[in-house]
Each structure stands twice: as structure tokens, then as C-alpha cells.
A protein has these predicted regions:
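Polyanion-binding surface elements
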Residues: 1-22
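Short amphipathic alpha-helical interface segments
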Residues: 1-4, 56-85, 89
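Short amphipathic alpha-helical interaction segments
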Residues: 21-28, 85-106, 112-115
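Short helix-start
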Residues: 29-30, 34-57
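Beta-hairpin "wing" of winged helix-turn-helix
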Residues: 36-39, 105-109
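Minor-groove-contacting beta-hairpin "wing" of winged helix-turn-helix DNA-binding domains
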Residues: 41-47, 111-120
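Short, amphipathic alpha-helical interaction segments positioned at domain boundaries
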Residues: 56-57, 115-146
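C-terminal single-pass membrane-anchor helix
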Residues: 135-163
Length: 163
């Protein structure tokens, strides 16, 4: 969550931001991390997103899971390790890979459930606009390049300090 006090947005603003009917959000509020029902109505933590519809998505391998994660972040929708059928640490590692490849960035909002703490960069949005197959292949290469560059940098620093 936020380092300072938790910030809230108006329920009406959340409804407007999501593009989903108010009645649907009220009915499904328990499935939306960050929406809290009170006696006076609903409170929404800043940065809350409506869940990504993963129904027709094929999660065949890690590339398709990474692409789905990037797509959900790009659409400002909630997704977590559960929807991607991953262990929590694998999910964190995928987020770290996308972050190091420059495809996503932290958004500094209060809701950090799942991938809510991240937004797509311009490069990430460009991947989403390509065909799925081409984007998945290039996504793998981009992440591998970013991770490889990081690994080589760390190794060279280790060897330099040992010498």
C-alpha cells in the first residue's frame, strides 16, 4: 500500500474509470480487491482495478502468461498469480522481468494487490498492439536481453571487485 496514509477515490469515479456498470460492480465487489462495502456505501482504494476477464485466454506456457499479464496491465485491469495459475514468487518474478525489460513501470498508487501497482510503458503498449504470436516471440527476446544485460553487468562487477 501507500507509504503514507491510504488514499481513496469516489465510487462513482471508479465506476467511470472501469467502464463497467455500477450494478455489476456492486454485485461483484467481493471479487475486486480494494473495494470495501461500508454502511454508507462503498469505499475504493486509489489504484483499484476491475478484474481482467481471463475466460477465453489460453495459458499454455510462460510466454502466454507473460503476455496475458502485460495485456491486463495495459487495460488497467486487475490480475494476480491465481488467474495466471502461478505460484506467488513466479508472479513476482514475471513482474520483475517485465519491469527490467522496460515494458511496465510502478504507478505509485495505493492499491498493490496483484499487478495493480504497475502501468504499461509506451514500449509495453506497442507490444500489445502487435499480433499475439509476434508479440509473444518478441517479448521473450526483450526480456531475455534485459535479464542477460543485467546478469552480465552484475557478473562483471563481481569479477572487478574480486580482482
Amino acid at each position: 500500500m501507500c507509504k503514507e496514509k491510504i488514499q481513496y477515490i469516489e465510487f462513482e469515479d471508479f465506476v467511470n474509470n472501469t467502464g463497467v456498470k455500477e450494478s455489476t460492480i456492486k454485485r461483484r465487489y467481493k471479487k475486486i480487491p480494494g473495494v470495501i462495502k461500508t454502511k454508507k456505501g462503498f469505499r475504493v482504494i486509489s489504484g483499484t482495478r476491475y478484474p481482467y476477464n481471463i475466460g477465453n485466454t489460453k495459458l499454455e506456457n510462460s510466454a502466454s502468461k507473460r503476455f496475458t499479464l502485460l495485456k491486463a496491465i495495459s487495460k488497467y485491469q486487475y490480475i494476480s498469480h491465481k488467474e495466471l495459475r502461478l505460484e506467488p514468487q513466479q508472479f513476482v518474478d514475471m513482474l520483475r522481468d517485465l519491469l527490467s525489460a522496460g515494458l511496465i513501470q510502478r504507478n505509485n498508487l495505493c492499491n498493490t494487490y496483484g499487478a495493480n501497482a504497475y502501468d504499461c510503458t509506451q514500449l509495453g503498449d506497442e507490444f500489445i498492439n502487435r499480433t499475439d504470436k509476434a508479440a509473444k516471440n518478441e517479448l521473450i527476446n526483450t526480456i531475455a536481453t534485459a535479464v542477460g544485460t543485467f546478469t552480465v553487468t552484475v557478473l562483471s562487477q563481481v569479477f572487478d571487485s574480486a580482482a
